[in-house]
Amino acid sequence: MFRRALMCCIAFVVALCPGVMARTWELPPDVKTLPVNGYEMAYLERGTGVPVVLVHGTVSDYRWWAAQMEPFGERSRTIAVSLRHFYPERWNGEGEDASVRQHANDLAAFITGLQAGPVHVVGHSRGGDVVLLMASAHPELLRSVVLMDPAPLEALLPQTPQATAEAEKRRSFVSAALERLQQGDIEGGLERFIDGVSVPGAWQKMPDPQKQTMRDNAWSIKSLLTDAKEPFTCAEAGNITVPVLLVTGENSPRPYGVMMEALAPCLQQHEKVTIPNAAHAMNRANPQAFNAAVLEFLAKH
């Protein structure tokens, strides 16, 4: 009887707050949430001090930063977020509110909600684009920015035949991956996507725990076709007033290098670092070198 009364009270409160989406998924141990723009944004936290917010890319979530949480947490309040519709939510791809712009707005609201003053923020791949858009609109929320191989935004790329060909190649394999997902072939869709952003055979060589993380977030591929056309300009990048570190892997695919070469002249202040013996997943492939480089940068700011 008490349980039924309690559930009725909860339903009544939710009905009075239609702008807040009730969470229907379970949270893993140690994972917290913070309400942002009507969504419960999940995050994992370690350490104390000035916050460092870590933002994952496509087919990933807060677990992407496993090799950073403890080393970073020894020096700062380290917070790895899961963006809207990423694990631990079990999203089925329905809806249109998982764009890079929505995620940038959510990230700004999340940082504001921490009520901890300006933060350092680190973004990988598409997460780098999320950070880039957020930092341009809200530099006052930040101490510094780290961008790891941000995904190519077509509006920033040079208008050359090579850049056009690379953009078309990316659209092609993303479209093929999405088509397989829509056919119910999750494994095939992920294989097509991962081999496209990395090298042929990359999916088959990946350890199963990493594959499972990507299975949990497979439908995040859906937004990539529209994300690439986000009308972000060089002038907007120039709004970022805090120091920026651009990070790439020694063996990162060329499109990421083209993106950073186009972005760098737009920034008011930036540094660059290349992580040896690593490609696009540089924080996982060579965590020791990555952690040392990023922590050194953060310590200066």
Regions found by a protein language model. Give the residues of each.
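Conserved alpha/beta-hydrolase catalytic His-Asp/Glu region
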Residues: L181-K222
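Conserved hydrolase catalytic core segment
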Residues: G117-L156
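Alpha/beta-hydrolase fold catalytic core
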Residues: M1-V52, R75-S76, A299-H301
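Active-site nucleophile elbow and catalytic-triad environment of alpha/beta-hydrolase enzymes
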Residues: G196, S220-E236
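Active-site loop/oxyanion-hole signature of alpha/beta-hydrolase fold enzymes
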Residues: E70, I79-V122, R126, A292
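Conserved loop-alpha-helix segment in the C-terminal half of the alpha/beta-hydrolase fold
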Residues: C234-A278
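Catalytic active-site module of serine/aspartate enzymes centered on a nucleophile-bearing elbow/loop
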Residues: Q269-H301
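Conserved HGGG/HGGXW glycine-rich cap/lid loop of the alpha/beta-hydrolase fold
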Residues: Y39-G93, F110
